[in-house]
């Protein structure tokens, strides 16, 4: 299960940033008591969009216990990989620590962008984590419009999701006016999914939200992802991208092309 919240931050030097908080529930079923889980992970969709790289910065990882207790994980100084790391006498790298593997993506070298949680040998149990990370270049600016593009979940593990709940919060000062924006969702076997809007769910923000259950979370091989796009134009073309990075199409009028691609999808 995933509970996702993204907050748009359009401030100097922030490069189209959103701050993301996720609560992840893992239902662990190890093959045997002699073959336990020693690490869990959350893939971070890794890609270049219009010439700029979607970057991540991990701020914190916490384990949430059923009684409400919170255990704050420390950052591990290196990738916890060799068999010699997995011994009780050496806790420098884990368990109880996390590591941000930055990639770049290379399956031949077993290299992916993800957050790894080093755990103490799990067999059959349910564990909950809360992670906070920053995603850069989610806000893209063009000559006559802007796009908030959130690649929220993808990869092989998407087929194991039981539920996915999300909120996207845009500060009121950065939210385009009605008639100056549209929203498109992407993914699942239906190709898109419904969402809701609220002006008062989170004070100070305009909120987009959606909830997907096991029935919704069915995918074809060509659309194993969950994505959200907010497109602004007209008088509010740059309402949430004043401080966005310069991309390959920063100075080019792109609204018609984006509309065409949305319609074709």
Residues of each region from the PLM?
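Lumenal/extracellular ectodomains and adaptor appendage modules
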Residues: 1-265
């Amino acid at each position: 299960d995933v509970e996702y919240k993204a907050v748009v931050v359009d401030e100097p030097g922030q490069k189209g940033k959103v701050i993301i908080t996720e609560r992840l529930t893992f239902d662990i079923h190890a093959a045997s008591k002699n073959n336990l889980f020693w690490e869990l992970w959350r893939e971070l969709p890794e890609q270049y969009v219009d010439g700029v790289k979607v970057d991540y910065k991990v701020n914190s990882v916490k384990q949430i216990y059923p009684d409400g207790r919170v255990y704050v994980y420390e950052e591990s100084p290196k990738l916890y990989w060799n068999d010699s790391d997995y011994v009780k006498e050496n806790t420098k790298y884990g368990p109880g620590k996390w590591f941000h593997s930055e990639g770049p993506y290379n399956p031949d070298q077993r290299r992916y962008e993800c957050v790894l949680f080093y755990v103490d040998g799990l067999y059959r149990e349910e564990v909950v984590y809360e992670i906070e990370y920053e995603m850069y270049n989610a806000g893209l600016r063009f000559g006559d419009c802007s796009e908030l593009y959130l690649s929220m979940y993808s990869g092989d593990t998407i087929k194991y999701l039981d539920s996915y709940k999300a909120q996207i919060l845009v500060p009121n000062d950065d939210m385009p006016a009605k008639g100056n924006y549209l929203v498109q969702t992407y993914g699942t076997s239906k190709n898109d999914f419904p969402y809701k809007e609220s002006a008062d769910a989170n004070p100070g923000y305009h909120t987009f939200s959606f909830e997907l259950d096991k029935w919704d979370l069915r995918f074809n091989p060509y659309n194993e992802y969950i994505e959200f796009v907010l497109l602004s134009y007209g008088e509010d073309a740059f309402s949430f991208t004043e401080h966005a990075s310069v991309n390959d199409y920063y100075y080019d009028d792109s609204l018609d092309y984006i509309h065409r691609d949305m319609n074709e999808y």
